[in-house]
Curated annotation (Swiss-Prot):
Pfam families: NDK. InterPro entries: NDK-like_dom (IPR034907), NDK-like_dom_sf (IPR036850), Nucleoside_diP_kinase (IPR001564), Nucleoside_diP_kinase_AS (IPR023005). One of its GO terms (cellular component) is cytoplasm. The gene is ndk. Its EC number is 2.7.4.6. This is Nucleoside diphosphate kinase. The active site is at residue 115. GO terms for biological process: CTP biosynthetic process; GTP biosynthetic process; UTP biosynthetic process. Its cofactor is Mg(2+). It catalyses: a 2'-deoxyribonucleoside 5'-diphosphate + ATP = a 2'-deoxyribonucleoside 5'-triphosphate + ADP; a ribonucleoside 5'-diphosphate + ATP = a ribonucleoside 5'-triphosphate + ADP. ATP binds at residues 9, 57, 85, 91, 102, 112. Belongs to the NDK family. It is an enzyme of class 2 (transferase).
Length: 141
């Protein structure tokens, strides 16, 4: 069973879409292994997105991700990383396929509702950023 990390971003929380997005995730066959509501500081957002430090959008991304509460979650499913990326759609909601999370709920490329890990390796790294081993308990059945 593969795992991936998602973050329901501050715009998702602000628009009161947490339940709708989690419903879509669960209906797609994902199991929520761990979940918490938290607020990132600019420092923690910067550390999480450090891979983008040299990109022109880094400052705006950090500012946005620290603008309000977010909901990181570890999800589990066969082929979790790839399937979740398909479920959420393209980064830019204008380019996302119909029915995807971003097409349904996102306003812009910058405020696009949800983060999803882009590889199994990054999913493990990102999951450990938010959750301890004890919090990321194995789901049975």
């Amino acid at each position: 069973m593969e795992r991936t990390l998602t973050i329901l971003k501050p715009d998702c929380v602000r628009k009161q879409l947490i339940g709708a997005v989690i419903d879509k995730i669960e209906r797609a066959g994902f199991r929520v292994v761990a979940m918490k509501k938290t607020k990132l500081t600019t420092e923690t957002a910067g550390a999480f997105y450090a891979v983008h430090r040299e990109r022109p959008f880094f400052g705006e991304l950090v500012e946005f991700m620290s603008s309000g509460p977010c909901v990181p979650m570890i999800l589990e499913k066969e082929n979790a990383v790839e399937d979740f990326r398909k479920l959420i759609g393209a980064t830019d909601p204008a380019e996302a396929e119909e029915g995807t999370v971003r097409k349904l709920y996102a306003d812009s490329k910058g405020e696009n509702i949800v983060h999803g890990s882009d590889s199994e390796e990054n999913a493990q790294i990102e999951s450990s950023f938010f959750f301890s081993t004890e919090e990321a308990v194995r789901v049975n059945n």
